Amino acid sequence: MAKTIAYDEEARRGLERGLNSLADAVKVTLGPKGRNVVLEKKWGAPTITNDGVSIAKEIELEDPYEKIGAELVKEVAKKTDDVAGDGTTTATVLAQALVREGLRNVAAGANPLGLKRGIEKAVEAVTQGLLKSAKEVETKEQIAATAAISAGDVQIGELIAEAMDKVGNEGVITVEESNTFGLQLELTEGMRFDKGYISGYFVTDAERQEAVLEDPYILLVSSKVSTVKDLLPLLEKVIQAGKPLLIIAEDVEGEALSTLVVNKIRGTFKSVAVKAPGFGDRRKAMLQDMAILTGGQVVSEEVGLSLETADVALLGTARKVVVTKDETTIVEGAGDSDAIAGRVAQIRAEIENSDSDYDREKLQERLAKLAGGVAVIKAGAATEVELKERKHRIEDAVRNAKAAVEEGIVAGGGVALLQSAPVLEDLGLSGDEATGANIVRVALSAPLKQIAFNGGLEPGVVAEKVSNLPAGHGLNAATGEYEDLLKAGVADPVKVTRSALQNAASIAALFLTTEAVVADKPEKAAAPAGDPTGGMGGMDF
């Protein structure tokens, strides 16, 4: 395919036009009085959202240079979303301000590499200042306030704080669509996985269609169990102990399954067979998690263990096991707390080293099942469009709350960024580097100005007033009052604020140092073929 090349100012201005097109669509959503954006979908109902990254992903521009500019800003929003879960609109607004100021200075003759170094040093200084000034999140109310700011809804904030209080900071909070109106919170105690009983005959509570085992032995097998002679020696020992048995294996089938079912129906011996969750290596890892949680061992040929020689000492135990047709819950496994803590540390290290979002998510789920618990927030709404929008807001708010617990909170509403500007005076930079630091100083006020503008206030006046207020005091755009924002519950996680600034500065530096852009040449659409009949073909007179 033929390429088109633009140089110097033409190249940078083309990229900037693309950036502005995207940023102008995204920044209207910033702040408590920000508006929504409607996204057309090829199939189904349109999506209504105020999430920066969702809007950015939908924007495709026609001009090749503008398209590249927009793609670069999408990267800012996506990276901020990946790292912090929120702050995508703030990152986009900061990127736009940094690029606008930077290009103005490049056009005036400043050296782009000098500006880049100045921007990087300034951003590092502001980041360190933000981390130092961050307040630790200690109370449920602080978590609720932070999540409520992200979701724009106090009830959602309170529900997320309640969920985090119950499952701990390591716990998993998932959001599901509900058929009923409003919000509900469901909590799971113990380890739950998405596999139920293999046969309905194992049910002990016919009304609830559940199999409940009190104080059972738990047999974990990495292979299929199909012949009864493999199981018999172990079954006899379990029957002598007078305890029920939960078998979790790749599969339980044939005569092994029918023997368990017959003994259950006759009342001789209570047991339940369940397929192990996951596939391949993930299944092995989850079985090992269960073994550590219940104080048992996985019967596997890899470690030289077989069912025929298995002893009761290899079995895990728990206070209670509840099995439905779809899921199994192990409550209060009898595993050693030090072994569980070691396994948790190992999974946490795997999360740190993983490059794949999917793997990270699955590891996080495993971590939660071992260390915390699982909370499900069920969201309902009047229409499907509203439901999708609400679910998205809750997911963002959950990640926001977790980020707040991780690194602490700073004053929200763009105030923390604006009031970080004085740290730039101590850098002692000169020449183009000092100009680069000044570009950052100007950009730091952009989020607050946009929030003020969206709230119908004069941006310049608000920024001037807030810069002269004590640290942490600023505009509460929801009420229009100037007050102590942390006390008023207007807070942002410092992880979100610093990620937005770092990612915006990274892309802005690339913009400024660009000297040529190579893009695909738009193909001209072929002219439609002429009709040999002169347009009269096929007509019946």
Swiss-Prot record:
One GO term (biological process): protein refolding
InterPro entries: Chaperonin_Cpn60_CS, Cpn60/GroEL, Cpn60/GroEL/TCP-1, GroEL-like_apical_dom_sf, GROEL-like_equatorial_sf, TCP-1-like_intermed_sf
Localization terms from the record: Secreted, Capsule; Cell surface; Secreted, Cell wall
Transmembrane segments annotated in the record for this chain: none
Claim: Chaperone is one of the keywords in the record: yes
EC number: 5.6.1.7
Cellular-component GO terms for this entry: capsule; cell surface; cytoplasm; extracellular region
Alphabetic keyword roster: ATP-binding, Cell wall, Chaperone, Isomerase, Nucleotide-binding, Secreted
Record bears the keyword Secreted: yes
General function of this protein: Together with its co-chaperonin GroES, plays an essential role in assisting protein folding. The GroEL-GroES system forms a nano-cage that allows encapsulation of the non-native substrate proteins and provides a physical environment optimized to promote and accelerate protein folding.
Quaternary state and interactors: Forms a cylinder of 14 subunits composed of two heptameric rings stacked back-to-back. Interacts with the co-chaperonin GroES.
NCBIfam families given in the database record: GroEL (TIGR02348), PRK00013.1 (NF000592), PRK12849.1 (NF009487), PRK12850.1 (NF009488), PRK12851.1 (NF009489)
Similarity comment text for this entry: Belongs to the chaperonin (HSP60) family.
Protein name: Chaperonin GroEL 2
Gene: groEL2
